[in-house]
């Protein structure tokens, strides 16, 4: 029987959907103009699409990548926007659109996946002591490990 994803997971999925849609628009624009590098956006679409499917299925590895990759990419995006604005290489409107369309949704994904109901959905709450855990017992995160009681499930 499949579990229904809680609200924070749906928020993360919706935020990833915004990022995927914006990436698709940018990829189509660059492909249409004949610019090189449009395939990078296509790769990002595929990567985020796989991540989105994993989040909906309750895969722990997707939770791990979604939580931390989204945070790192959001920080990199904000730093890039700040650098572009400080060197006057970006207009404020473009930076605001990039922040609202990419960085903010990425931060929303990371925050939403850190909620207690998201931990429970991805079976990241220790059955022995009830402590939430974000540590995997193996490389692919098929089993989780509790920091507090060292239980593996």
Predicted segments with their positions:
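Topology signature of small-to-medium multi-pass alpha-helical membrane proteins
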Residues: 1-142, 148-153
């Amino acid at each position: 029987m499949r579990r229904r994803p809680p609200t924070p997971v749906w928020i993360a999925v919706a935020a990833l959907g915004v990022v995927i849609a914006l990436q698709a628009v940018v990829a189509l624009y660059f492909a249409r103009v004949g610019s090189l590098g449009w395939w990078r956006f296509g790769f990002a679409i595929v990567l985020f699409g796989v991540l989105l499917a994993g989040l909906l299925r309750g895969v722990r590895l997707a939770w791990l990548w979604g939580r931390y990759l989204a945070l790192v990419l959001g920080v990199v995006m904000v730093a890039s926007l700040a650098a572009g604005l400080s060197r006057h290489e970006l207009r404020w409107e473009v930076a605001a659109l990039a922040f609202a369309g990419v960085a903010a949704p990425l931060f929303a994904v990371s925050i939403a996946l850190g909620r207690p109901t998201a931990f429970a959905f991805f079976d990241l709450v220790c059955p022995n002591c009830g402590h939430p855990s974000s540590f995997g017992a193996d490389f692919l995160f098929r089993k989780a490990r509790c920091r507090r009681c060292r239980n593996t499930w």
